[in-house]
Swiss-Prot record:
GO BP field: ether lipid metabolic process; lens fiber cell differentiation; lipid catabolic process; membrane disassembly; N-acylphosphatidylethanolamine metabolic process; organelle disassembly; peroxisome organization; phospholipid metabolic process
Keywords: Cell membrane, Cytoplasm, Endoplasmic reticulum, Hydrolase, Lipid degradation, Lipid metabolism, Lysosome, Membrane, Mitochondrion, Nucleus, Peroxisome, Transferase, Transmembrane, Transmembrane helix
Membrane-traversing stretches: 134-154
Domain notes: The C-terminal transmembrane domain is required for the targeting of the protein to damaged organelles.
Protein name, UniProt field: Phospholipase A and acyltransferase 3
Subunit field text: Interacts with PPP2R1A; this interaction might decrease PP2A activity.
GO molecular function: N-acyltransferase activity; phospholipase A1 activity; phospholipase A2 activity; phospholipase activity
The encoding gene: PLAAT3
């Protein structure tokens, strides 16, 4: 039997499983979350809008978790609690509520929804998704470079034997 999803508590980070990425929000109580959304987002489109990757601005929104998640699964994921001390819950909520309605800078690689919620909870802006993509891209690049080098070495060796 699968364990039930724990009920979020104010200040919890909510990880929403979108088809190709994870969207993040912070739970502020009474069923609501605060999260970043593209300024052009239409109601019901959710943060899965492709426009989120194409704009440099976002709007801080307070919406029902049910509406933000839509049909996507979500979980409480305070994954950095062992590394960073969460700020007091009242401060997390206050900071989140103060930002609602504001337009903020949005960069997929340095100021995205995961950076935003980690900054609110821990005072540290970080995104493991971005780090993981950079590591994977670096590994792929090194793999291609190694294959190219091996190809050049075999090519030279073959020419020398002729």
């Amino acid at each position: 039997m699968r364990a039930p999803i724990p009920e979020p508590k104010p200040g919890d980070l909510i990880e929403i499983f979108r088809p190709f990425y994870r969207h993040w929000a912070i739970y502020v109580g009474d069923g609501y979350v605060v999260h970043l959304a593209p300024p052009s987002e239409v109601a019901g489109a959710g943060a899965a809008s492709v426009m989120s990757a194409l704009t440099d601005k976002a709007i801080v929104k307070k919406e029902l978790l049910y509406d933000v998640a839509g049909s996507d699964k979500y979980q409480v994921n305070n994954k950095h609690d062992d590394k960073y001390s969460p700020l007091p819950c009242s401060k997390i909520i206050q900071r989140a509520e103060e930002l609602v309605g504001q337009e903020v800078l949005y960069k997929l690689t340095s100021e995205n929804c995961e950076h935003f919620v980690n900054e609110l909870r821990y005072g540290v802006a970080r995104s493991d998704q971005v780090r993981d993509v950079i590591i994977a891209a670096s590994a792929a690049g090194m793999g291609l470079a190694a294959m190219s080098l091996i190809g050049v070495m075999f090519s030279r060796n073959k020419r020398q034997k002729q």
